[in-house]
Amino acid sequence: MSHLLEVKNLDVKFDTDEGRITAVENISLSVDQGEVLGIVGESGSGKSVTAKSIMKLNPGNTSYNEDAEIILDNENVLQFTSKQDLKKIRGGKVSMIFQEPMASFAPAIKIGAQMVEQLLIHKNINKDEAKSISINMLKRVGIADAEKRFNQYAFELSGGMRQRAMIAMALSTMPKLLLADEPTTALDVTIQAQVINLIKDIIKEYQMGVIFITHDLGVIAQVADHVAVMYLGSVVEKGPVNEILKNPKHPYTKGLLQALPDINNLDA
């Protein structure tokens, strides 16, 4: 059976005034329907560049190697050149949750209007149906007074509520693949736990594939089935999450594990 997503031999380079810089090199990974792949690594390791490549969201100075493939739903995304092809996947087949929701919402447009616009682009429905789906999804992610929030701007919501609204927007089109880029980093511990549980519930309910990006192996342990550890633009270790956590092979993975707090020895 083919994977929902398969990335093969991906190199991503950026052309700069100082020359061509390699951001990620020889990345190969896969995600199946209903599976969560965690990608973990420090800032600058290439996690987000890899994820954005799946939607071709990297900037205009980006180049990909000719033998690379990003096979999504049996199509090679790297061969997409028209806006129409890319529109099919951006917010349709693939949705992305970003670390900072204020960067995702247009500040001068109400949240509901943005959700409705996205649904009208990707679904064969009318405006009233799109509004109903949007409000129901806001309720689904635990936002009280969803009808009221639908008519508010992003800056009027708390940080945790904005994050939930962004998750609702990402999920409203029922994507096959969800890219979650550090979705809990900016939240306090209580809200972080709620958002993680919400994402887990929705994955189970809708059976979508997920790439969950973070610098925190503790979060990966809670949500992921498999994990890929990235360091300096390369995947240095990957496998089932329990196997990697119990028996890490690479020194960098061991270092990440050693940095986790020992809940059994908090007074040490």
Predicted regions and their residues:
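ABC ATPase NBD Q-loop/coupling interface
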Residues: 15, 69-88, 126, 197, ...
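A short, surface-exposed alpha-helical micro-motif characterized by mixed small hydrophobic
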Residues: 220-222
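A short, flexible loop at the N-terminus of ABC-type nucleotide-binding domains that lies
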Residues: 4, 13-26, 57-63, 81-84, ...
